[in-house]
């Protein structure tokens, strides 16, 4: 393992994934940080990218966004086509409403790579929504809903309501918000949208 072969990045990555499954975020961050000094030009690029990806996710869990973004940049240096990193990085930028053109570009690459992935379609729709491209956002959120049929996530359904609202379909929007609530979304903002029957920004 790590103690016997400190240069072997795969051990660190597997440990980090194990910690992630048990939501042991501090351990996940610690093991990723231990791996970083062992990354060099001889390292397997994909594994190095995955280590930085874990580091980015760990920092984001701790709301250390700048550090998270730096880690994602490093990850993409080692593997520019790391689709989950492109998606997470883009989505987190959109939540902060920062660097939205970059977010849109990264997100677009993910839906080109996996056109039926509901998570990636949702991210792309959400970025378009934040940028005020409501009609286009609706096309992609409809795709996300279709891709998730029968197994919809409350976040995607809430986003769907927001996008429909901004497209002037208020009744439909309220239905989607109600559905998001039924799916277990406990957000106070969502409850406010339903009560006021209008879109409320996070």
Language-model regions: role of each:
Residues 17, 57, 91-92, 126, ...:
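Residue-level recognition of tetratricopeptide repeat
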């Amino acid at each position: 393992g790590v103690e016997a072969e400190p240069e072997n990045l795969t051990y660190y990555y597997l440990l980090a994934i194990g910690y992630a499954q048990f939501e042991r975020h501090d351990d996940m961050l610690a093991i990723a940080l231990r791996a970083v000094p062992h990354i060099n030009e001889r390292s397997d690029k994909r594994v190095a990218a995955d280590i930085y990806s874990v580091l980015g996710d760990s920092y984001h869990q701790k709301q250390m966004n700048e550090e998270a973004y730096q880690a994602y940049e490093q990850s993409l240096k080692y593997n520019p086509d790391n689709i989950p990193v492109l998606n997470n990085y883009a989505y987190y930028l959109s939540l902060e409403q920062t660097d939205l053109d970059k977010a849109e570009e990264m997100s677009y690459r993910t839906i080109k790579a996996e056109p039926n992935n509901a998570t990636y379609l949702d991210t792309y729709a959400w970025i378009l929504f934040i940028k005020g491209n409501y009609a286009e956002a609706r096309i992609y959120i409809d795709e996300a809903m279709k891709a998730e049929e029968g197994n919809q996530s409350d976040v995607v359904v809430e986003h769907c309501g927001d996008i429909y609202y901004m497209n002037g379909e208020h009744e439909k929007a309220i239905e989607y918000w109600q559905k998001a609530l039924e799916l277990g979304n406990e957000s106070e903002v969502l409850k406010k949208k339903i009560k006021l029957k209008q879109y409320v920004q996070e």
